[in-house]
């Protein structure tokens, strides 16, 4: 292989690695959060409604124009959970879903079980409340 061919092949490989890394996982760095000061009492059935809502946001936001609102009716006397999932338009559907799934798994710790929260990662956002949003 000549030096010119080797240089070209090396350049193509470097470019391929850069493109692959740029198209990789979403940016899930925490940007901001704001949480209601009231907490969900331990064992409250609202946890179940909210958990189902978060899964709904994770699964459907990417396929609803990257901006999706939903609610989960209260059960066991618990209030209805309302929420919104949003992703940057510049990321792929799979990255949107991955970002929201990442956030859904972290939101309990970030919000410290608040009855309402807004949490922004670099590539996605979730808001949930006990009232319509």
Curated annotation (Swiss-Prot):
Induction: Induced by abscisic acid (ABA). It comes from the Eukaryota. GO terms for cellular component: plasmodesma. One of its GO terms (molecular function) is D-mannose binding. CDD domains: Gnk2-like (cd23509). The keyword S-adenosyl-L-methionine does not apply. Disulfide bonds join 87-96, 99-124. Residues 1-24 form the signal peptide. Alpha-D-mannopyranose binds at residues 36, 118, 129. Residues 28-133 form the Gnk2-homologous domain. GO terms for biological process: defense response to bacterium; defense response to fungus; killing of cells of another organism; response to abscisic acid. Keywords: Antibiotic, Antimicrobial, Disulfide bond, Fungicide, Lectin, Mannose-binding, Plant defense, Signal. Exerts antifungal activity through its carbohydrate-binding specificity. This is Antifungal protein ginkbilobin-like protein 2. It comes from Picea glauca.
